Amino acid sequence: KLLHILHTEAAAGWGGQEIRVLQETRLLLERGHIVSLVCQADSPLEERARSISNSRFHLIPISMKSALSLWVFLTLYCYVSKNNLDVIHTHSSVDSWLGGVVGKLSGVPVIRTRHVSLPVNDFFPNHLLYSYIPQRILTSGNMISNIVKQVRCVDSNRVVSISAGVDLRKFDSEISGKKIRNELKIETGQFLVGKVGVIRGWKGHNYFLKAIPLILQEIPKARFVIVGDGPGFEEIKSKVKLAGIEKKVNLLGHRDDIPEIIAALDVQVLASFAGEGTPQVI
């Protein structure tokens, strides 16, 4: 059966969660479904979603600053009422309240996805986001499922773990990293270690930087690359300079050629110590 699915995402950043929402949107469209996407206005997700050219795709950017916004609620409710939706799929807290309540009032089934392994506040009324409102709760891994199942009044039979997928059309073992190594001026046989991901607290970039001098003691010619942007970018950039390792570390910022970058690495590091669901870079 072909469905009309409404994705909602209030996050304003660009990381694994937002990438997954966009990937699912594209793949659902490939399978013939109708997809509407309500996303944070002026966000990276909106910018990238605008590149989707498909008559079955509908983009609705809205400024979703608060779950208590009556204007946003009414906008969503009117959209749902005028369109024959089969599912509302929510992702972040703000849009889960707005989309979830709209779904309940309009009789459209709600799916809530929990992407991160951070603790869930199960005090009233927050636990309603996982108990009363959704028909199903999807998580990005078993660890997150176990966290959600501990929330008050949650039916564990409604919690399903679905890890992030990999598009093997893009990530192919035959992809060459030569172009990237040339760009970074990496010599033949020179060791390249990289970390790919949004730069924020729990991603462990500080640990990655602390490990670099230790590695250089053993492999003096090793080079390092940090790929990604985020709220901690300037801080990490300053720490690289302070440590005097600018000639050994390249900060590339956001890149879209991740398959080629991964192919160029000898070692890829995941230094996260919290928050992960299914790290897509792995």
Identify what each model region corresponds to.
Residues K1-I282:
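Membrane-interface segments of envelope glycosyltransferases acting on lipid-linked substrates or membrane lipids
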